[in-house]
Amino acid sequence: MLAARSTHDVLNQAPPLAPYNVFDADLVLREALEREGGGWGVDRLRDTGELAGSVEAIEHSERCERNEPRLRTHDRYGQRIDEVELDPSWHWLLRQAVEREIHSLPWRDPRSGSHVVRASLMYVWSQVNAGVMCPVSMTYSAIPALREAPDLAEEWEPRLTRPSYEDGALAGMAMTEKQGGSDVRANTTHAEPAGDGNYEITGHKWFCSYPPCDVFLTLAQTSAGLSCFLIEGSDPGFRIQRLKDKLGTRSLPSSEVEFHGVRGRLVGDEGHGVRTIVRMVNHTRLDCLIGSASGMRWGLAQAVHHARHRSAFGRLLSEQPLMQNVLADLAIESEAATATAMRVARAYDEQDAPFRRFATAVMKYWVCKRAPQHALEALECLGGNGYVEESGMPRLLRDSPLNSIWEGSGNVAALDVLRATLKEPEGLPAFMAECELARGGDSRLDAHLDRLGDLSRDPEFEARRLVGDLALALQASLLVRNAPPAVADAFCAARLEGGGRVFGALPAGVDAGTIVERALAV
């Protein structure tokens, strides 16, 4: 009789990366935090990083992704209730973000570097779950717009910035309509004076993210034109029609809503709603940039960890030249995105308005556009294991296009940059002055800077290429000034000399081993 044999032993599989400290493992973030003025937040980041890389946090994230939100429009008696049911793990994740003041830190503690520290916290916690950061971002971003109405700010800002999930409040936005999309001036929702200084708003919104928010900023037409209003989610005229069945961020309820005589309170000047709400939009665009950089970082960490523990054809993947090329290319893309996100966040601390507005628009376009390609290549580094839901890589890939669509898709973002050169002529010179700080540090960057033309004279047809060239100039400048020579050299070689059609096409001579070693400090 044959002896019993096992079908197989589990060999040559990478061990789980968790538990690990997301912050401590990220040398690039640690350096950027210090460089951009947020060094005082190290302990806060280390504490958040430990939780973000814990098995507990990862399990909560996986659970709320499996148990998607569900809308109950009516109770058993037929009464309208519009209740969104969310998994307890969603509340756990959101509570952690609120208690760590990711939604409010710069407004509660406006010292130098607070936007950088807050951006770093956003970057770390986004690696746990991207969907949960949407209400966090909107609440953070609503404050500058709300301050256009001092009485409303006095009433709501204390609650919106409170680091308490139970006693605080969350803010959302509702701008997009069926017929207009990003063209909010085509909105048909209208607001009529109610006779008490407020307005009655009637209409619809095609996208309203996180309808459980306590308050929303929205746009509606008045006799003076498009205006910005604050509405409350508890208003009986605020009706959730359905939840969106989306490609990604499936833990996050996004909805269609109707306003049936909802009470609205004017924010800013009547007829100047776009000018008012853009104060919110600029901050959410910053968070789109941070979120995409965070996704790149998470994908890179998974790819490098896998390659360090997986062997093929007699060698670890991380020791094989072509895999080193791919990993190094992913690493320089991630480092450039992280460095840029933190530099732009510093501009919010410094109130450097011309650079801040222009750089936010440029880098939101570029980094968010690069994220899906980066996610796909990181997934492929894990082979078939990366194609399986349990790895988390499919979720990363599904989530990655969102930030390029939110707050203006690629074309809208690129055209905004061109318009900014005309409407805010000080923006481009401020941006170029930052790029020029690296002049003389690398001949390839110098040549790239010389090639950049006057955007105000270029047609819309070339907008994406032009804005991409600007983005690469800033990224290369930051790396030449601040990154190790191996990183800066590889980036300039791959991004400024016409190569890099796919990740993993770095030219010969780059120090891929050094770059990959730097990528994950565990």
Q: In which residue ranges do the predicted regions lie?
A:
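A short core secondary-structure module
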Residues: 198, 202-238
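Internal helix-loop-helix
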Residues: 78-168, 208-210, 334, 399, ...
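C-terminal amphipathic alpha-helical interaction region
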Residues: 424, 437-522
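C-terminal catalytic subdomain
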Residues: 396, 400-439, 467-475, 483
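Flexible, small-/acidic-enriched active-site or ligand-binding loops
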Residues: 237-261
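A glycine-rich, basic-preceded beta-loop-alpha segment at the flavin cofactor/substrate interface
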Residues: 256-284, 301-318, 425, 448-460
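C-terminal helix-coil-helix/basic helical segment that borders enzyme active sites and/or dimer interfaces
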Residues: 335-366, 379-380, 453-463, 467
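Extended, charge-enriched "interface" segments that sit outside catalytic cores
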Residues: 1-111
